[in-house]
Swiss-Prot record:
Keywords: Cell membrane, Lipid biosynthesis, Lipid metabolism, Membrane, Phospholipid biosynthesis, Phospholipid metabolism, Transferase, Transmembrane, Transmembrane helix
Main EC class the enzyme belongs to: transferase
Reaction catalyzed: a CDP-1,2-diacyl-sn-glycerol + L-serine = a 1,2-diacyl-sn-glycero-3-phospho-L-serine + CMP + H(+)
EC code: 2.7.8.8
The keyword Transmembrane helix is annotated on this UniProt entry: yes
A single Gene Ontology CC term: plasma membrane
Gene: pssA
NCBIfam families: pssA
Family: Belongs to the CDP-alcohol phosphatidyltransferase class-I family.
Location of the protein in the cell: Cell membrane
Record organism: Mycobacterium tuberculosis (strain ATCC 25618 / H37Rv)
Protein name: CDP-diacylglycerol--serine O-phosphatidyltransferase
Membrane association type: Multi-pass membrane protein
GO MF annotations in UniProt: CDP-diacylglycerol-serine O-phosphatidyltransferase activity
Length: 286
């Protein structure tokens, strides 16, 4: 009598991650409908909802131990719709339809998202990747590409018409985003980022400010996120190169890696670039 309800509840919970993925697809497709009806605010809100559901479904699957090959395939298809097709069509309908090149650049973006997702799936099955590879994306992830696209619409909503709504700038930005998607540039995964304990209070303060900005100035917050993400890329490249040169720390925790890097800097105070330029530390004689 008691075992059956528990079993039934277990089966129901197993489909929860896939149900969340399907809901995210519905949100993404409905965003296109609102864009066609000239309601960009609703379209942007639904894309954000799709992104939130996309970020949660995988975590819920791991918590419930409900990971499956079918769920992974559905999630990949949802990413293609929500972060490839939907942002492209929303931006085209809202801003690019009057420009002859508009359709070409949104097609380029959508195709690059699909190629990027295909490469990601292929790398997941590649057993030859180094141990640190799971900490980095290869190229810009699809959700970040969608934020970059919606950022153009956010500029228009915040500041109205201007050079940022011109055909040449829109084409340049969309093309640049498309190139980043299929590039080989390493970009840090969020779950691989660790915050030292002494910065925890500052991080919580930043999160509180972001929560307030999401209500008071959501369009500006989108651009703060875009700029912050772009600024992290050089640090991600540097981190990936350092890890590639130090296989002895691949299995270490972030705190231990930071200690190794500090020790390395103390052991080699002069960087190669300083030596090439003939630079020296202040107060030292040649």
């Amino acid at each position: 009598m008691i075992g059956k309800p528990r079993g039934r509840r277990g089966v129901n919970l197993q489909i929860l991650p896939s149900a969340m993925t399907v809901l995210s697809i519905c949100a993404g497709l409905t965003a296109i409908k609102f864009a066609l009806e000239h309601q960009p605010k609703a379209a942007m809100a639904l894309i954000a909802a799709a992104a939130i559901l996309d970020g949660l479904d995988g975590r819920v699957a791991r918590i419930l131990d409900a990971q499956s090959r079918m769920g992974a395939e559905i999630d990949s298809l949802a990413d293609a719709v929500n972060f490839g097709v939907t942002p492209a069509l929303v931006l085209y309908v809202s801003m690019l339809s009057k420009w002859p090149v508009g359709w070409v650049v949104v097609l380029l973006y959508a195709v690059c998202v699909v190629l990027r997702l295909a490469r990601y799936n292929a790398l997941q099955d590649d057993g030859t990747q180094p141990a640190y590879a799971h900490e980095f994306f290869v190229g810009m992830p699809a959700p970040a590409g969608a934020v970059s696209m919606i950022g153009l619409l956010a500029l228009k909503m915040q500041f109205g018409e201007g050079w940022w709504t011109s055909g040449w700038f829109l084409s340049f930005w969309v093309t640049g985003t498309s190139i980043l998607l299929v590039s080989g540039i390493p970009m840090k995964k969020m779950h691989a980022v660790s915050v030292p304990p002494n910065y925890a209070a500052a991080l919580l303060a930043v999160l509180a400010i972001c929560a307030a900005a999401a209500v008071l100035a959501p369009y500006l917050l989108i651009w703060v996120i875009i700029i912050a993400y772009m600024c992290h890329i050089p640090f991600a490249v540097r981190s990936q190169r350092w890890l590639a040169q130090h296989p002895e720390v691949w299995d270490d925790k972030p705190k231990q890696r930071r200690a190794v890097r500090r020790a390395s800097r103390r052991a080699h105070p002069y960087r190669p670039s300083m030596a090439r330029l003939g630079l020296r530390k202040p107060g030292r004689r040649l």
